[in-house]
């Protein structure tokens, strides 16, 4: 989605719910990447615990992707499909999306990812 503003919409919420990250962890990662102020409505200790959890998950995720590539389960076609999905979701970030459009995008995205994850 690039470095622009990320809108919290139905599609993004769906993706976060099914990801390995909580919405708070995603928020911390995003703000750190952008260089935005870090501690907001939480103690410094809680923030740094959340940051460590987020980093650990990201670290593990990158190793998992590497492992899947080595095993041939994350090939070029899979990368291309994920890239197209990412670009389509990025388009929904440019303007307000009607509820029926969001549901359709979510349905298609979920179906594609389910097919890709069959082992």
Regions found by a protein language model. Give the residues of each.
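Short alpha-helical "packing" element that flanks the helix-turn-helix/winged-helix DNA-binding module
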Residues: 24-32
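Intrinsically disordered, low-complexity basic tails/linkers immediately adjacent to helix-turn-helix/homeobox/MYB/SANT
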Residues: 64-94
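C-terminal flanking helix
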Residues: 55-62, 66
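Amphipathic alpha-helical binding modules
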Residues: 87-119
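Charged, amphipathic alpha-helical oligomerization/scaffolding segments
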Residues: 53, 80, 84, 108-111
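Short, Lys/Arg-enriched N-terminal segment that forms or immediately precedes the first helix
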Residues: 2-18
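Helix-turn-helix DNA-binding module
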Residues: 31-43
């Amino acid at each position: 989605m690039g470095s622009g503003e990320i809108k919290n919409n139905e599609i993004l919420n769906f993706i976060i719910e099914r990801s390995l990250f909580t919405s708070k962890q995603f928020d911390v990662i995003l703000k750190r990447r952008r260089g935005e102020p870090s501690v907001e409505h939480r103690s410094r200790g809680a923030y740094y615990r959340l940051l460590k959890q987020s980093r650990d998950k990201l670290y593990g995720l990158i190793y998992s992707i590497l492992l899947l590539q080595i095993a041939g389960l994350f090939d070029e076609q899979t990368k291309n499909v994920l890239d197209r999905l990412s670009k389509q979701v990025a388009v929904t970030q440019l303007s307000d999306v009607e509820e029926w459009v969001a549901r359709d995008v979510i349905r298609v995205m979920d179906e594609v990812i389910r097919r890709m994850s069959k082992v």
